Amino acid sequence: MADVFAKNIAVSAEDAAKLTPRAEFRVFGRDIIESVKEHMWECKAVLYKARIMPEEVYVLSKNTNEANVKVRDGLLDIKTRVGVTPEGYEIFQPRGKFQFPVKKEELATILENLKVEINLDKSEYTFDEFCDMVRENSKLALVSVEKKRYGFSVNDVICEYAYVWMNGALVESLNEHSDL
């Protein structure tokens, strides 16, 4: 049986640029996972992975919700929303994964997608310098995120339910990813 998650792996900006945009439908709430677990087997779901993810740091912008920027495994990762399907699925395109220290030009692109202007006076920035920059900007916020994810598929469509802690507060998530 093919691993439907394998085709979505990217470890560099070049790899991310080659990925096909995918449509995502995601909900957050409380007490949604039990219902999913009760009904997923009726759909002949195939469980692939249960994973405890390393801590991630998300960057939120008051100026836009079109950019998804996070730091995971030492990489500054960005994808942008490029559309919405008629059914309401958001379409995201990976834009790159950048190793720290991040070059000024790469960081400028990320800040542009977050719709903020910050004077970049150095040629590169460490993770700590990046976080300090975000904290100092009133339009940006850092959110610490921890996830326990359960990946499965239904008819080769990637799905996942997860327990997500955002700055320590627990919320449940359910999502579906579909390549375009």
Residue ranges and their predicted role:
Residues 153-166:
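Extended serine/threonine-enriched, polar tracts that run as long, contiguous segments within proteins
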Residues 166-168, 175-180:
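Mixed-charge, glycine-accented linear interaction segment located at domain edges/termini
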Residues 79-81, 162, 177:
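Beta-strand residues in well-ordered beta-sheet regions across diverse protein folds
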Residues 148, 157, 170-172:
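A short pocket-lining beta-strand/turn micro-motif at the edge of beta-sheets
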Residues 98, 164-169:
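A short, sequence-level motif marking secondary-structure junctions
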Residues 20-22, 169-173:
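Short, solvent-exposed beta-strand edge segments and adjacent coil->beta transition regions
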Residues 46, 155-157, 178-180:
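Generic structural signal for short, solvent-exposed loop/turn connectors between secondary structure elements
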Residues 2-153:
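N-terminal strand-loop-strand beta-hairpin
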